Amino acid sequence: MIVGRFPSSRPRRLRRNENIRRLVRETHLTLDDLIYPIFVRWGENVVEEVPSMPGVYRYSVDKVVDAVKEVRDLGIPAIILFGIPEHKDEVGSDTWSEEGIIQRALRKIKKEVPDIYVITDVCFCEYTTHGHCGVLHDHDVENDLTLENLKKQVVSHAENGADMVAPSGMMDGMVKVIREALDEAGFKHIPIMAYSAKFASAYYGPFREAAESAPAFGDRRTYQMDPANSREALKEVLMDVEEGADVVMVKPALAYLDIIAKVKENVLVPVCAYNVSGEYSLIKAAGKLGWIDEKKVMWETLLSIKRAGADMIITYFAKDAARMIIEGEV
């Protein structure tokens, strides 16, 4: 590849003013790239801020519609729902109950805000007494028993209005059985966004407070991925695509930009990246202390995720980013 030499080649010529920089800009972040996470909890008339995530709230079902309308009115096309039930049990049965927290939220949102695209997180950690992502056996998650419960959960979500389901538990074979369950129940049109490369990350701390989903014992390293592994991430992604994933995800995003890029180069399905709670809270905390320009660092972070190859980004910054776009700050 010939790139030219100085002095005949001067890259600064194309940085001389904002107009030329706009013309040659390679990566663009738009409203169409954003998905906003929303926490729905039990109770009534509840709007409570998550202490470790300034600006992020938990909503009761009767209050969640206002939050969704705000997202819709900003031009953000999609939300992803996480539920916090009143009652937990050993298997997380609220996840497939007709009166489960997600089911009630889905019905209300789809009735009152039908033009928002609703993705549901499909897992068990928020719903089990032990905080792990499935059925326990000998102090570990039993993979195949968990698959049976996942099938019940996704069909229930689809019946109550989910536009897309997003299994996040990192169970082997989960995409295959979910696709089969949806198809058999008459939901062949419902896509699957698989949390394909989900790492056992320390960046999840604030989320576990928000969703009340911290494990009661041990950790999740027997099912979530080792942060040291890159080739294994690609293996997980390719297996999910073969099993029927319509979208694949890398989580977290910022510390795993290399994984996003590798996945993008090796699959033909859209790639989602999850800009997780710890990434959000780090920027919020440093911004509050005046150590960084919060808006600029937030924008640069999201832009880096898009540049790495993400086709869509789940981010708690979605509303902030949308306002910057609308107000012409970028």
Swiss-Prot record:
Name one process (GO BP) from the record. Answer: protoporphyrinogen IX biosynthetic process
- Reaction(s) catalysed (UniProt annotation): 2 5-aminolevulinate = porphobilinogen + 2 H2O + H(+)
Residues binding 5-aminolevulinate 2, per UniProt: S277, Y316
GO molecular function per UniProt: porphobilinogen synthase activity; zinc ion binding
Q: Does the keyword Acetylation apply?
A: no
This protein's pathway reads: Porphyrin-containing compound metabolism; protoporphyrin-IX biosynthesis; coproporphyrinogen-III from 5-aminolevulinate: step 1/4
Under InterPro entries, the record lists: ALAD (IPR001731), ALAD_AS (IPR030656), Aldolase_TIM (IPR013785)
**So what EC number does this one have?**
4.2.1.24
Source organism's superkingdom?
Bacteria
Q: Which UniProt keywords apply?
A: Heme biosynthesis, Lyase, Magnesium, Metal-binding, Porphyrin biosynthesis, Zinc
Where on this chain does Zn(2+) bind?
A: C123, C125, C133
Q: Name one GO cellular component term.
A: cytosol
Q: Which residues bind Mg(2+)?
A: E236
Q: How is the cofactor bound?
A: Binds 1 zinc ion per monomer.
Cofactor(s) required, per the database record: Zn(2+)
- Tell me which residues this entry annotates as catalytic: K198 (schiff-base intermediate with substrate), K251 (schiff-base intermediate with substrate)
Subunit record text: Homooctamer.
PANTHER family on file: DELTA-AMINOLEVULINIC ACID DEHYDRATASE
Q: What is this protein called?
A: Delta-aminolevulinic acid dehydratase
